[in-house]
Amino acid sequence: MKMQRSAGILLPISSLPSPYGIGCFSQEAYDFVDWLKETGQTYWQILPLGVTSYGDSPYQSFSAFAGNPYFISLDALVEEGVLTAAECKKANFGRKADDIDYSRLYAERGRLLRLAYSRSDIGHNEAFTAFCEKNKWWLDDFALFMAVKGRFEGKPWIEWAEDIRLRWQPAMDYYRRELYFEVEYHKYLQFKFDQQWRRLKAYANSKGIRIIGDIPIYVALDSADAWANPGLFQLDKDNIPTAVAGVPPDGFSPTGQLWGNPLYRWEAHRATGYQWWITRLWYCFELYDVVRIDHFRGFDEYFSIPYGSETAAPGHWEKGPGIELFRAVEQALGKREIIAEDLGYMSDTVRQLVRDSGFPGMKVLEFAFDSRDTGSASDYLPHNYPVNSVAYTGTHDNETLVSWYQTISDAERAMVRDYLYDYATPDEQLYKSMIALILRSAAARCIIPMQDWLGLDNAARINKPSTVGQNWRWRLKKTQLTKKLQKEICQLTTRYGRKNWA
């Protein structure tokens, strides 16, 4: 079957324009969908929608299933009558339209959402009751987890009192009674998130725009998932990790990356027929049209680092579940659209797993000319892209195209010019030639980060791996979505046979 050529834009929900401190499911999100349609795009790729924790990373969430309350539209709550426009306008979310001030966001949004809950009379809402019943398999544990975390002043669950840390039944019953209204508050937030996200996704689909969601391979240690299902993770009898996730040293990081996530106890998953993973992916496809799985190579082999290590250096490779997991998923769910994030260190067995799965892998232009790459740079040259792949200029973890070109070596810049056969275009405009380069590649799908279409520098970078403090903050300004840019994107998308004519 011939694969339809298509294109899309990568923009996190958090990066949408908004007067309330962070991008959310407000009118600006609907306007962006309309803008995507006018540019001829087929896909809107986003980052994980989970509840963020310390460091604000969407890849370290308190739950694999819960949504981020920061994305709840305050305007929609005003329309419901549980907030007033004056209350929202009075809140101080920070002064910069292109930045997210998470400390202010935590205080101001939290206050407003609690106010909305107090006025909601949610206990008499039949839709809320139905939502709670339908989702109780994850919602009950998550809401209790968040309520107890509040009682213990935000401490990770492995530092809670022993009775609730180990989920002894008397303690579970006690906290459910003691924290009843706090538990209901967290259920209310998930209800509003779910309601608003499904409405936005339905609107996008009605305009011919499909959503590419993103899930991390691992859950966070401090998550409701690890607390509620300790037997599925490599934890000891006291529910403390024995080993954690990361990646080994390479040309980009001399000590590797220590992520700290608990590793899966794959034999326990296998014994259940991979039910937890099947359920997780089923739920993802309730929310998204296509799912990108981060760190796909971890299903072939995963890097195991002894708990307590200061760097990833002492780690070693362990065998993962391989294709068996995805055969079980396909048997349960049928064929689904998954993108395998197969970047980084690649072995022959990882490549074979991607081939066996049939999922498209990822091709990132920036990796094609980088001397720090560990030997597979030619895989990322656009003339080598297979049809069954998704081409990117860069991802949320990369420098923007403009800054990347400025920071690579003279020799690498010469390689770019030679490959483009372009010696005349000024440096500051060369990003357009690079975007056109991957748009005309054979890859069936091509996704361009919004910052690259805008020609922005690293001030608009989403994330710099292995750093904390200044990540996940960039926001798009509404004035940047110009008619001129819209026309330019549409022309290039059409020229290379990727326009969505729906």
Task: Label every model-predicted segment.
Residues 38, 164, 171-172, 474, ...:
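Domain-scale activation on soluble regions of proteins
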Residues 37, 197-205, 330, 354-355:
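Surface-exposed amphipathic alpha-helices with a cationic face
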Residues 47, 210-212, 216, 290, ...:
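Outer-envelope exported proteins of Gram-negative bacteria
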Residues 4, 12, 18, 56-194, ...:
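Alpha-amylase-like alpha-glycosidases and glucanotransferases acting on alpha-linked glucans and related
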Residues 1-40:
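Mature N-terminal, pre-catalytic/accessory segment of carbohydrate-active enzymes
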Residues 186, 190-219:
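Conserved, well-ordered alpha-helix/loop/beta-strand core segments that scaffold catalytic motifs
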Residues 27-52, 287-288, 438:
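Catalytic domains of carbohydrate-active enzymes, especially glycoside hydrolases
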